[in-house]
Regions:
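Structural recognition of an alpha-helix C-terminal capping motif at a helix-to-coil junction
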Residues: 33, 47-54, 67-79
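Sigma70-family region 2
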Residues: 13-14, 40-41, 53-68, 87-88
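Short, charged helix-capping/linker segments at alpha-helix termini
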Residues: 13-22, 32-51, 169, 191-198
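C-terminal edge and immediately downstream basic/flexible tail or linker adjoining helix-turn-helix-like DNA-binding
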Residues: 11, 40, 93-99, 111, ...
């Protein structure tokens, strides 16, 4: 029987390096994907993921299984990503979002679009829609963006997201409501054409 994340982390706390390797292999890709959606830069997302795992490892002795491991890990990731976004805004105010999405490096990111052997045209339309949705999500205020990404892409429940964002569940629901309303406004042309569902 496979060990739970909590069991693995308790083993890491006890000095088991292989358990840490298992956690790293299990969560590296989802963590990098989440961080990419937050910071919109593959290299920065990779660096932040390494920093998250480094912080998890350094804090192993303080780990207490009072919350799910993923809640703890994504809280660290969210804080690092928000700090990175804030720092980046101050350094690169003149770079537009369009310029950052046109680099070859960013073209390598995974898209959450189902593959049912679509035609080239369907694939292009699907990529365009996904890009429009991600641009709209990226334009949200930081906390709203984090809440939407944790809810829709990481599929965390309200309680977990509230812990990650350090707010009450009712405050989170209000935050998500405002975020989805903002997305509806931003994506209205796509929604009105039945192109996308928010």
């Amino acid at each position: 029987m496979a060990r739970t994340d909590v069991q693995l982390m308790l083993d890491v706390k006890a000095g088991d390096e292989q358990s840490f390797e298992l956690l790293l292999r299990k969560y590296r890709t989802p963590l990098v994907n989440f961080l990419y959606r937050m910071v919109r830069n593959t290299a920065v997302a990779e660096d932040l993921a390494q920093e998250v795992f480094l912080r998890v490892y350094r804090a192993r002795q303080e780990y207490a299984p009072s919350a799910k491991f993923t809640t703890w890990m994504f809280r660290i990731a969210t804080n690092l990503a928000l700090n990175s976004v804030r720092d980046n805004r101050h350094r690169q105010m003149e770079i537009s979002m369009d310029q950052t999405t046109d680099t070859g490096e960013d073209e390598q990111r995974p898209l959450d679009v189902p593959d049912r052997a679509p035609s080239v045209e369907q694939e292009l339309v699907a990529r365009w829609r996904a890009e429009m949705i991600m641009k709209a999500i990226h334009a949200l205020p930081e906390k709203q963006r984090a809440a939407v990404l944790l809810h829709k892409y990481q599929e965390l429940d309200y309680d977990e997201i509230a812990r990650v964002l350090d707010c009450s569940e009712s405050a989170l629901k209000s935050l998500l409501f405002r975020a989805y309303e903002n997305l509806r406004v931003q994506l209205a042309p796509l929604v009105n054409n039945n192109s996308v569902r928010v």
